[in-house]
Amino acid sequence: MTTQITYFATAARGFEEMLKTELEQICQAECKVAQGGVHFTTTQRGAYQALLHSRLASRILLPLVTTKIFSDLDLYATIVGINWAEIFDPRDTFFVDFNGTNREIRNTQFGAMRVKDGVVDYFERKGFARPTVDKDHADIRIHVYLDRENMVVSLDLSGDALHMRGYREDTGKAPLRETLAAAIILRSGWQKGTPLVDPMCGSGTLLIEAAQMQAGIAPQLHRKHWGFNAWKGHQQAVWKEVLEQAYLQQNEEIQPLFFGFDLDHRVLAKAKQNARNAGVAHLIQWQQGDVAALKNPCPEQVGTVICNPPYGERLGTTPALIALYSVFGQRLKHQFSGWNASIFSGEPELLNCLRLRSHRQFKAKNGPLDCLQKNYQISERAVAEQQADELKFEQNAQVAPDFANRLTKNIKKIEKWAKQQGINAYRLYDADLPEYNLAVDRYDDHIVVQEYAAPKNIDEQKARQRLLDAVSATLYVTGVETNKLVLKVRQKQKGTNQYEKLANKGDYFYVTEYGAKLWVNLTDYLDTGLFLDHRLTRKMVGQMAKGKTFLNLFAYTGSATIHAALNGAKSTTTIDMSNTYLNWAEQNLELNNLPLRNNRLFQADCLQWLAECRERFELIFVDPPTFSNSKRMEDSWDVQRDHIKLMTQLKRILTADGIIVFSNNKRGFKMDFEGLAELGLQAENISHKTLPLDFERNPQIHNCWIIRHIEN
């Protein structure tokens, strides 16, 4: 058994050097790092030891043939030429893992099929029974790697991938692979025999892997099925010796210095069961708790805090995550002075919310996600800085002090005015500072942060970090609960994308505006159901509507209709192309106890409806989109190009003393006064009168006009 054979251990990208060190320690192998793994030369006993003890390897492969192929015929000939009868019995099932392509073999499925054909044909030509393919529980797994013309055919000695330790029956959301968890621990700097705390432990993988390391429990000690069980070269006696030695190496006399916390008691129950399955239940203390109340379970010792907190791809929403990471950083500095911390995250920007300086960092993949692990020393200096920060109001404003100061100033001015006005939905910040290109709106006790799309010349990562900083500052300055802060990315509208649904939460609540109650939805659509900049326009329309027949075109959710009806309009007619928003308008009418018999709703293309309308109206409010090319409309619409065409139709249904209130959001809009005059209409620009205090910093957000018949 002293024959030296070169095997290949596969690993996740970035872990190759760590795996090399591990294999050298496990079986004193001669190792050579390659992309995606390590070639290691050892005895068969050494290979068994690697299979049993490696925490980082994904698979251990025994190369059978290394050759060059240029076509599928070359591939087939190579496979048929292997003496499979010396490797496994045809009565055993097999499966083919095929990785890689070249010019002739362009997909892995085809490559696997040709390998399967070659294996089956080999046995049939030798007069053996045809072996069966089993995808899920194969006795033998054949691994083929193809890189251009270079091909390696191997026997997979692992069977199932080695990250499948067998102890994890069930998981919470977004679990870590055990091999990744082991790598995180090894990179964390944690020393065996010192405390290890995971404040958001989930299903417990990090703590279980670390506890097994300290207890000397081989990660595959309880695995029953191996890829070598049906291999004819398997040495059962040697394997038995390796297994017995692994049992003897276990250290049962160690202190229980592992502590897991999680807010979810159901996930914690799964973690406890996983620990029992892994044989380390007696080493880990579990406790349900919020990270905001985290306390050091071993204040008299120095240890390591290790954690894989939630991030955007995993759980939660960004505002909640910013708050979570911020409070986590505070608790680390409060409770773990002198300790080390190692935090792994799929959103590196969130790690900045910890407000700690890292001394080492590592890149890694968690599935398709690019992740970052940062190591910190929680020094006395960091703790002192934290305590000093808490004496100042600016403790969170330090994140984005200019933004926080401006937001605070705006709040003092605007909220007093809003209370006097009788409104509880208004804008607090609107890209006042160019480096914080976003808007902050209040809807009663909710806050909406809308990020405007950054210019192409702005670094995406820098823009993302500024957004996170601004959200963090907004949470602190406003005092809003994290679950009541909504974050949106607003881009330049194209066509009718304001109608596209973003979510399906169905969370509606109403806000008040000059006596009107209006439903809003902050999560499901790009817009909320209420254009805040048109607040004074709606108020004015309501005052003008008393005793008049009122038409609301491009009505959106009908908020102007509500003001008109509440102020005594003789009748209202509301037109919009979207059934969703028309239903919303109906709900607004019901909320204000306004009967449908006097307030009609029609779903229609507004321009087409106008062309067919035979009624006349005394007051018309029209707020068309800047541009639209909806499939429901016969032609595209451009407000600059087509507004005279629209006025031509409106004049026809306007009473002799009637008024059109025309508004749009096109910056730089130019009214065609000559075209209006030819129609016998005149326009007065009242934009400055319809700009509320909370939008005075953005005077071009809309333009508004009063249009009448020219007096004879």
Swiss-Prot record:
GN (gene name): rlmL
Cross-referenced InterPro entries: 23SrRNA_methyltr_KL, DNA_methylase_N6_adenine_CS, RlmKL-like_Mtase, RlmKL-like_Mtase_CS, RlmL_1st, SAM-dep_methyl-trfase, SAM-dependent_MTases_sf, THUMP_dom
Single annotated GO MF: 23S rRNA (guanine(2445)-N(2))-methyltransferase activity
Main location: cytoplasm
Every THUMP domain range: 46-157
Gene Ontology annotations for the cellular component aspect, listed alphabetically: cytoplasm
Enzyme Commission number(s): 2.1.1.173, 2.1.1.264
Cellular localization per UniProt: Cytoplasm
PANTHER family noted in UniProt: RIBOSOMAL RNA LARGE SUBUNIT METHYLTRANSFERASE K/L, RIBOSOMAL RNA LARGE SUBUNIT METHYLTRANSFERASE K_L
Domain of life: Bacteria
Disulphide linkage map: none
Record PROSITE patterns: THUMP, UPF0020
Role, per record: Specifically methylates the guanine in position 2445 (m2G2445) and the guanine in position 2069 (m7G2069) of 23S rRNA.
Reactions catalysed according to its record: guanosine(2445) in 23S rRNA + S-adenosyl-L-methionine = N(2)-methylguanosine(2445) in 23S rRNA + S-adenosyl-L-homocysteine + H(+); guanosine(2069) in 23S rRNA + S-adenosyl-L-methionine = N(2)-methylguanosine(2069) in 23S rRNA + S-adenosyl-L-homocysteine + H(+)
Keyword annotations of the record: Cytoplasm, Methyltransferase, RNA-binding, rRNA processing, S-adenosyl-L-methionine, Transferase
HAMAP family: 23SrRNA_methyltr_KL (MF_01858)
Family that this chain belongs to: Belongs to the methyltransferase superfamily. RlmKL family.
Record-given protein name: Ribosomal RNA large subunit methyltransferase K/L
